[in-house]
Amino acid sequence: MAERRLLLNPLVHNFNYYVRHLSSPGYLLCEVPDAVKQELQNSIDNLEKTPETDARGSLRGHLEEEWHLPITPNMSTFCEHLSGVYLEKFGLQPSMGLAETMRDMTLVEFNLERLWINYQKKYDFNPLHIHSGVFSFVIWVQIPYELEEERKRYKSNGDETAAFMFQYLNSIGGIDTEYLYLDKSFEWKMAFFPARLN
């Protein structure tokens, strides 16, 4: 077999180029600090399930139990801090809907305005959706199964059954998916992300 060689013409092949990656906004994955965990657990343990605390009328989830929780001091401070960390790591993204109106982020105060808990049971699900506001988050408090158990029960060509996912348009208009494969190791972990991220 003859060896094939690429002959480089210095007039055409001698040039500089730069690689530029295009990306969508990311997310922060963190462990919930003990002080925040204690406040949330206390709110959950003392939750009064009343028509006033029923959150189902204002949420997209197809769940039997969604309840408003009180906003506690440590939770509020933690979310405010994460807002700053997010902007430090990812910057202000135009897709977050703020770039046109908020040029100086040092003048902006982020406040946690709504907090709720979902008790997801068999057949309950959250459809693809976005949230209001600038940032949103999910904290997994209790996961009643191991990932391997889910994979055995729902055999398929993918792991979507046992996954939390973000879907977003990439820079060329395709749909990309980021999966978080949840198991007990995700208990008291938090994903913090732009509210418009599905």
Each model region followed by its residue ranges:
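Non-heme Fe(II)/2-oxoglutarate
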Residues: 2-108, 116, 120-126, 160
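Catalytic core of non-heme Fe(II) oxygenases with the double-stranded beta-helix
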Residues: 113-192
